[in-house]
Amino acid sequence: MYKSAKFWDRAADKYAASPIRNQDAYEATLDKMRQLLSPDDTVLELGCGTGTTALALAASVQHIIATDVSDAMLDKGREKAQAAGTTNVDFRQSDAADAPAGPFDAVLAFNLLHLIEDMDGALAEIAKRTKPGGLFVSKTFCMPEHRNMIWWFIQLGLPIMQAIGKAPYFAKLSTSDLDAAITKAGFTIVETINAPGKDPRRTVIARRAD
């Protein structure tokens, strides 16, 4: 966790200042989450970054514990929560392995799983923290099926950036790899949503087996 935390601490200012790339798709994700969540839900978000999603969903649930490995990211989240007057989001430093035990009605992991070296281990920890029948929603970068510019960058450009400390670990997952890993962890997939256009991210909505 230490190496990853250092990278994201360095990236926090730039990350916080960067606009959301596809605002319409992001708003659609938030709308979907509001349909799935209930006012009495307790929620765990892993890899919350600067807390944008947790704060956007706070009014739809009872309580959110928003976690990240980066203290710098979390500090920005706390500042945003204070500015917004949001009191039901608790920001804590942790990864999946040492996240609060719960169990939670819902666990969220947006733009995270492809950045975890031991994804199977992380998913097992997520399952432990999800109530039986509870919700697990992830949005994950999956490799494009065709050799487009994104595919070539990941194959050729990303390793160079990683070598000089400008990019984190990145798993080259196919959609079938992702779905199989989530199922193996004890979840039943109820819906998948592929992002529109050239956005290679896949949303998986799953429930933990009773």
Predicted regions located by residue number:
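Conserved class I S-adenosyl-L-methionine
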Residues: 1-38, 144, 154, 160-162, ...
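C-terminal alpha-helical "lid/dimerization" subdomain adjacent to the S-adenosyl-L-methionine
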Residues: 22, 141-185, 191-193
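Helix-to-beta-strand junctions that scaffold the AdoMet/dcAdoMet cofactor pocket
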Residues: 38, 116-117, 130-131
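Class I SAM-dependent methyltransferase SAM/SAH-binding core
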Residues: 44, 50-97
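A short acidic, Gly/Pro-enriched loop at the edge of an enzyme's catalytic core
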Residues: 97-107
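A short SAM/SAH-binding and catalytic strip from SAM-dependent methyltransferases
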Residues: 106-119
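A short glycine-rich, Lys/Arg-flanked "PGG" loop and its adjoining helix->strand segment in the class I
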Residues: 120-132
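Conserved beta-strand signature within the Rossmann-like core of class I S-adenosyl-L-methionine
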Residues: 134-140
